[in-house]
Structure formats: structure tokens, C-alpha cells
Amino acid sequence: MPERARFVTHTGETVTAFALGRLEAVYYPGAVTRGADNVDYKFINGFVDVGELPCRTAVRAEIADRTVALKDDFEIVSTNLPGFNRRLEFSGFWHRPTRLSRWVRTRFVPPEGGDYSFRLATCGGVHVFVDGNKIAAFEPYTRNEAQETEIVLPLAADGSDLVMLVEEIAERDTNYFVELTWLGEGPLAAEVPGNADGKTLEMLMALARAIRPARIVFGEGEDLRLVVDQPATAAVTIEAKVHQSVHMRHLPPLFEAASTLAVGEKEAVFALPGELPDGYHELDIAFSLGESRINRTIAFALLRDDGPHRLAGDLAARKREGLSWLAEHGELRAGRVLARLALGLDLDDGDRAALEDTLDAIDTRRDCSDFVIVPLLWIYADHREALPPSLRKRIEAAILGYRYWMDEPGNDTMWFWSENHVLCFHVAELIAGGLFAEDVFANSGMSGREHAALAEKRLARWFDAVEDHGLAEWNSAAYYPIDFIGLLALQRFAGETLKTRAETVLDRLFSMIALHTINGVSAGSMGRAYDKELRAGPLSELAPFATIAFGTGWLNRGVAALPMFCAGDYVPPEGLDQFVAPPEGRAVSAHYVQGYGRAAQLALYKTAGVQLSASIDATPGAKGHQQHLVDVQAAGHPMARVWINHPGADDPWGSDRPSYWAGNGVMPRVTQHQNCCLFLSDLGENPRLAFTHAYAPLSVFDDHIAGEDFLVLRSAESFVALKATGPIEAVGEGPGAGIEHRVRGKRSGWAILVGALGGRSLAELAALAEGTNLSLSDDPLNLSCEGPLTPALRLDYRDGLFVEGRHAPFPTTSQTPEIAWLTAFAVPASN
């Protein structure tokens, strides 16, 4: 008999060793109802309490009087072991209301027989069975907000079988997990049942914990190489799948392959097909040996271009080149069809597939279908004569049958509440109403003329908010392209008043893009960020906008809005090029405010070689979301990016909001003085993760020197210097190897400096960084920085920045960037 895998949990730790049944997912919409219009147009970064949707109401009715029987014979398809997460986590994104359920099991062996307490946390529902008997049920079903209770389990001295049914109702992004904390005294052993060998499972889990891409980015002709820390002790099969982008996840994977990690080897190799597009790709991995199987999801960047594109000609010529690129390489979505029709090309099979998928998204009201109905309306308005009559009729039916706002009948989980979705829904309603003014819209019972009039009023409120407060999703590489969907469509189809207002906001967006783009990479502090935009700036959907607008950058397959920019006649303001590429020896400095309640006070320092930006003050000590507060991008390599945050989740590859790298679990106090940013973190008494960390991928910088409390990096002739209030621990194994640098403690501080080496060596800079004094003081909490690289700076946790002892409040309340030109900072001569 194989040795059963046994994992020990100590008091206060969570149990994560479980055998997993299949994830069951069933469409579950609930009754059609009219929602209440509760949008107040005060957009914030974070989850909005939107009330209860029909699917959740239906779940509550279902569970009220049901009886859940033990299912003791479910098929075990995978294993979850300690290492990724303190939760048993199945979170994800479902575009339609979906009932989720999964059976899991383990065997508990306590210190001795008796009744033992556990803390049980979840968002959905959990039913707990011990030795065949139902012991507990906990069903809060609170959307994405964990609830907890204490349960008592009777455990036999020689072990008890524990089975749980874990359930949730998915409404787009869904926190679906169980966190089971051992409160008893002494060690609790969890034995994973099944025929899987214990030692084999432990080996597979060690591989799954450690596996990561061998490179920050893979280029032309390179294989995908995945590395681990310890060699395999037996030949392990590794299956890998590259998924479509998040909005196309319902389609088959882009790539599937298997490789073998041979005995004694630490690298698995996958040949990447030429048709796999460039992108930051999610990669599902399955490790298997005999009957043992472990699953893991990671990601990797693929960028075959060895440098940014340099587009010749004026804006019109660059737009034409952009349309040609997208017509050939664009993702199979409505935007690609628009690009091809704008060029006068006939529909091909890919276009028809894209339109079929677009219509399905609209008809079934998938979340984010508002992002594709707008380009579909553009296609219909400008190119309907190029469409076959049958397809034209289907498009007309989809437009007339759509749900354009939450107060119309529906039982979907479309997200109506964030800044970008509000805009897209209102724009879609305006254009659809104008195109079909005399028709009755089947879902609402209103005429197109009534819809258009209502949309005008709603859009006026949206513009009032954005004009008064700026953007909650400032500078976001993920969400500016979505804003462009709505704004560019308004610029093309709206009446004069809304067109003018749209152009004003477009001008602001392109001004901010110009400020925050360096060598073709869109970077900078962001109101909402995900790992994919942070780790792979040139692969974001925002990057090509800068390429077309300013002539240098990266083109990729993103078609959410770029075809609308290229097919339309909007022209960004003149004079922005000077901010895109400052002259040698000069630096551009900018300060401005964005977001409701001055949520973001933004500072920028940028030279031709390096860019530093930060969001000042924010809400220190509060729970974070997706705010990306401190950012550095060097011009020497498109992936030469550095930032600091407090991780918001356990798993370095997880997708929580905030995640391990995107956003902050606990918000810091941040300030910036010219080329120096200070980051002061107070995590409170019982932080889930008691450290802050820097993302700094050493391999994409030309050189680096690390000291006990500093790290300096060179990119071409520019530098990035990090200094910390405690030892900087370079992570050498697992997903953080070569990129992650931690400072432990509930309170910590960092200084980030950028500039030109000015002919000095990196060693000279390292000596100056070592001689810089960065210190924390309590009562009141503050961070002081003094040394040869900066004036005397102090960041008070309550009162903000002091320069040479004088209080330096943020200098403006304007949404329009206040810009100054400075002499670029260069490393001074060492004494």
C-alpha cells in the first residue's frame, strides 16, 4: 500500500490538505426582475454594494428548506495541499450567473479523541460531514465578503473522515473559498485520502509551489521553459494549457501541450507554436504521476518583437497602419471586424465567428457585453450594407432586445456600477436609440427615441462627475481602453454637446498617456491594475494607443477600442510629443488630481531614460483594492519595471482584488518629491502578511548591486535605487525568485530614487545609497530620508511630506496636470 500523505496543522493555522471532486457549474439566473437604479455617479476604487441580484435571491429560497445528503463516492480529480494559499480556494470569473458546487474530503487525526473547535470562513455555503454524519452547515452567501463562524467537530483518536460540500453563486468575479482554522491544542494531522502516494503528492506539491517561467518574457523562436527549485525524483508529466483572454475564456484554449520533467531535472520545455499570439498568457498546469495529480495556474509573457515599432507618417497614416495590423492580427472580437470593414475588406470566417460570439454575448447578456455592443453598433451604423441580410437582421434583433440599464427587466449579472461600465451602457443606449428611434425595444418596451433621450440625461451625469472629480480608474492600462470604447463612439455618433464633452475627456486621457508613456510602454501609477498590465506593459491594450498617437511603441492583438480610434477622426492635442520623450538632460515634472474626493493626488518625474510616478496620501491604513500607488519604468527594457506594495493575498499567482502584486492589502502613506518617492507602511496589529515587498526583475536590468538594506539597478544610463528601513531579503526560490525583495515587519519604510548615472559607476551609486539614512520613528509615526542623493525628506504618517523641515502639501487641486521642466537628476560625485 502507498504511504498516505499526511500534513500537520498547528493551533491557529489553516487546513488546506484536501482531495477534490469535480467543480460543478450550472447556469442559475433566478427570476427576471427590474433592479433599482442606485448609481450615484460617485465612482470609487473597490467593490460596490449593489444589492441582491435575482440569482442570489433564488439561491436563498432554494437553501431555505432543502436537505443536503452526504455524497460519499465522488470522483477525486485533483489534490490541494499546503503551499499556495491559507484558503481552499476556487475563486474565478464567470460571465453569467452560475451555481457552483464542489465536494472535498480529508481525514483528520487529532492529538486524542474528542470534540474540537474550528473557525470556518466562507462567502457562499459549506456543509460539513464527519464520519458520515452531518455536523455543521454555514451558508451566509454574502457576495465576495467573507463571513465566519465557529464549529465543533467530533474527532476519533484514530482519525475521522471529513467531507465538505462547498458552494457559491457566481456573479462575475467571485470569491469562492473555505478557510478552516484549527483552534484546538496540539498538532492536527490531515491525511489526503485516495490511492495517491504520500511522498509522490509531496513531491508534486513542491514542484507546483515553485514552478515559474524561466524568463520574464519569451521572444521570437524561444520555447516556453518552466523551472522549479528542486529536481524531480521521478518522471512527472506536465500538461499545460494557454487560455484565451478573460472575455474569450468560454472558447477553446489557444494552446495545449504536454512535457515531461525527467528524473533529476529542474526544467520542463514546451515548444510554442508560431500562431500563438503575443500576450501575457494565463497557463493552467497539471502535474501527474500515477494516480497523483496537482493543478496550478501561473502566467507568462510572450513578446516576439525585439524593440518598439517606429511608425512613419502622420497620424492618418499611422491609423491606417493600425487598422491593417488589427485586421490581420487582432483578437477575434467585434473590433477586428470593424477594422476590416473600415479597410473595405470582405468578411472572412474569422469575422463571422467574431460576430457570432458577439451576438451570443449580447443575447445571453454576458458580463462585459456592454464592451462589445458599442463596436457592434458602430459596425451597424457605418457598414451594415456590407453585412449579409440574415446577419444584419440578427444584429438588429440583438440591439432591440438588449438590457441597457439595471432598471430594465433582467436576471443577468452584468456589472452596471463602475466608471467604465456606466459609460459604455449609456453610450450603447444612446446610439441604439438613435439608430432605431421609432422601433420598440423588446426588453424595456420603450421606443428608441425614449432610450436616446434617457441616455442623454444619464451621460450628462457621467460627464458632470468626471469633469468635477476626474477618473477613479486614473491612468489604468486595463480601463482606459474601455473608456475609449464609449468616448470614441460618442465623438463619432453623438450630438454636438456630448461630442464636445467626449473630446474634452479624450484630450485629458491622451495628455495623461503622453506623460506616463516611456519608450512606447504605458506605465505609471494606476487607479485600477491587474498583474497582466503591471508585469507586461507593452502587452496591455493601452500600449498601442500611444504607438498610433505618438509613433513609437508596441502593437498587439487588443481590439477593444483601438479600431475605433484608428477608424475615427479624433485627433489628440498638439504638443504632447514633448512629454512622451523629454530631451536629454531634462525632466518633466507633473502634479494633478483624479478621482472622487481627491482619491488620487498624482506626481510624476520623467526623463528620457526613466519614469517615477506615485499616488500621494490615498487612505493609509485602510484595506486596499486595485490602486497601484508607486511605479517605476525604465526605458532600457520594456519589462524593466519596479514597484512596491503590501501583498493583498497569499498566492503570488492569485487573482484576488487586491492580489499579491496588484494593489495593497493595507494601504500605505506615500509621497513623492521630484525623483524620490517615500513609502511608509503600518500594517496594524495582526496583519495577514507581515511584510512589504518590491517587484524588481533583476534579469531585465543591465546590472544591479544589492546590499543589506539597499538595491540599485542600472538600465542603460539610468538607475533605480531602493532603500529600506530593514534588511531587504531577496527571494531566491519559487514564483518570487529573481523578482521579489521583502522587508519584514508590521511597520516598514522604503525610498525609491531614479535618475541618470551621469558617467558614475553603479558601484559609486551603491556607496551613496548605502550612506543614505532612512529611518522610522514612532509617536508620531514618520519616515526620514537624509543623504547625498536627496534633500532632507520626512514623511509623517498623519501630516504628509516635509522637505528640509518645511511642510510641503500637495501643490494643486487641479485635474489638469501642472507641468514643470527640471534639470534631470544625475548621480553626484562621491567624496
Q: Which residue ranges define each predicted feature?
A:
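Surface-exposed loops/turns
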Residues: 112-113, 156-158, 278
